[in-house]
Amino acid sequence: MMFPLARNALSSLKIRSILQSMARQSHVKHSPDFHDKYGNAVLASGTAFCVVAWVFTATQIGIEWNLSPVGRVTPKEWKHQ
Protein backbone atom coordinates (compact mmCIF):
# COMPACT_ATOMS: atom_id res chain seq x y z
CA MET A 1 0.00 0.00 0.00
CA MET A 2 1.43 3.36 -1.02
CA PHE A 3 1.41 6.37 1.19
CA PRO A 4 -0.61 9.29 -0.16
CA LEU A 5 2.47 11.52 -0.41
CA ALA A 6 4.38 8.98 -2.51
CA ARG A 7 1.33 8.32 -4.68
CA ASN A 8 0.88 12.04 -5.35
CA ALA A 9 4.57 12.46 -6.14
CA LEU A 10 4.53 9.59 -8.64
CA SER A 11 1.37 10.78 -10.35
CA SER A 12 2.73 14.31 -10.71
CA LEU A 13 5.98 12.94 -12.17
CA LYS A 14 4.05 10.96 -14.77
CA ILE A 15 1.97 13.96 -15.80
CA ARG A 16 5.04 16.18 -15.93
CA SER A 17 6.97 13.71 -18.11
CA ILE A 18 4.01 13.39 -20.49
CA LEU A 19 3.75 17.17 -20.78
CA GLN A 20 7.49 17.49 -21.36
CA SER A 21 7.46 14.88 -24.12
CA MET A 22 4.52 16.62 -25.80
CA ALA A 23 6.35 19.94 -25.62
CA ARG A 24 9.49 18.32 -27.03
CA GLN A 25 7.60 16.84 -29.96
CA SER A 26 5.87 20.09 -30.82
CA HIS A 27 9.13 22.07 -30.72
CA VAL A 28 10.48 22.82 -34.17
CA LYS A 29 14.22 23.20 -34.63
CA HIS A 30 15.23 26.27 -36.55
CA SER A 31 18.80 25.17 -37.20
CA PRO A 32 20.47 21.77 -37.15
CA ASP A 33 22.44 20.95 -34.03
CA PHE A 34 25.78 19.14 -33.71
CA HIS A 35 24.24 15.67 -34.01
CA ASP A 36 22.33 16.61 -37.15
CA LYS A 37 25.46 18.03 -38.76
CA TYR A 38 28.14 15.55 -37.68
CA GLY A 39 26.35 12.54 -36.20
CA ASN A 40 26.76 10.18 -39.15
CA ALA A 41 30.39 11.18 -39.70
CA VAL A 42 31.25 10.62 -36.05
CA LEU A 43 29.48 7.25 -36.08
CA ALA A 44 31.23 6.14 -39.28
CA SER A 45 34.68 7.25 -38.11
CA GLY A 46 34.23 5.54 -34.74
CA THR A 47 33.14 2.33 -36.44
CA ALA A 48 36.10 2.47 -38.83
CA PHE A 49 38.51 3.07 -35.94
CA CYS A 50 37.17 0.09 -33.99
CA VAL A 51 37.30 -2.20 -37.02
CA VAL A 52 40.89 -1.17 -37.81
CA ALA A 53 41.94 -1.62 -34.18
CA TRP A 54 40.44 -5.12 -33.99
CA VAL A 55 41.88 -6.17 -37.36
CA PHE A 56 45.32 -4.99 -36.24
CA THR A 57 44.96 -6.80 -32.93
CA ALA A 58 43.79 -10.02 -34.55
CA THR A 59 46.48 -10.13 -37.24
CA GLN A 60 49.60 -8.34 -36.06
CA ILE A 61 50.30 -8.97 -32.40
CA GLY A 62 50.99 -12.69 -32.72
CA ILE A 63 48.10 -14.31 -30.90
CA GLU A 64 47.92 -18.05 -31.57
CA TRP A 65 44.19 -18.53 -32.02
CA ASN A 66 44.10 -22.36 -32.34
CA LEU A 67 40.75 -22.25 -34.07
CA SER A 68 40.74 -25.74 -35.60
CA PRO A 69 43.10 -28.70 -35.27
CA VAL A 70 41.99 -30.19 -38.60
CA GLY A 71 45.03 -30.86 -40.78
CA ARG A 72 47.50 -30.07 -38.01
CA VAL A 73 46.92 -33.01 -35.70
CA THR A 74 47.82 -36.51 -36.85
CA PRO A 75 46.74 -39.53 -34.83
CA LYS A 76 49.40 -41.76 -33.30
CA GLU A 77 49.68 -45.39 -34.24
CA TRP A 78 47.62 -47.72 -32.05
CA LYS A 79 49.75 -50.05 -29.95
CA HIS A 80 48.45 -53.62 -29.82
CA GLN A 81 49.39 -55.54 -26.69
Swiss-Prot record:
Record-annotated membrane-spanning stretches: 34-60
Family of this protein: Belongs to the cytochrome c oxidase VIIb family.
CDD domains: Cyt_c_Oxidase_VIIb (cd01403)
Any GO BP: mitochondrial electron transport, cytochrome c to oxygen
InterPro entries according to UniProt: Cyt_c_oxidase_suVIIB, Cyt_c_oxidase_suVIIB_dom_sf
Mitochondrial intermembrane side: 61-81
Gene3D superfamilies: Cytochrome C Oxidase, chain K
Subcellular location: Mitochondrion inner membrane
Annotated organelle transit peptide span: 1-25
UniProt lineage: Eukaryota, Metazoa, Chordata, Craniata, Vertebrata
Organism: Macaca fascicularis
Name of the protein in question: Cytochrome c oxidase subunit 7B2, mitochondrial
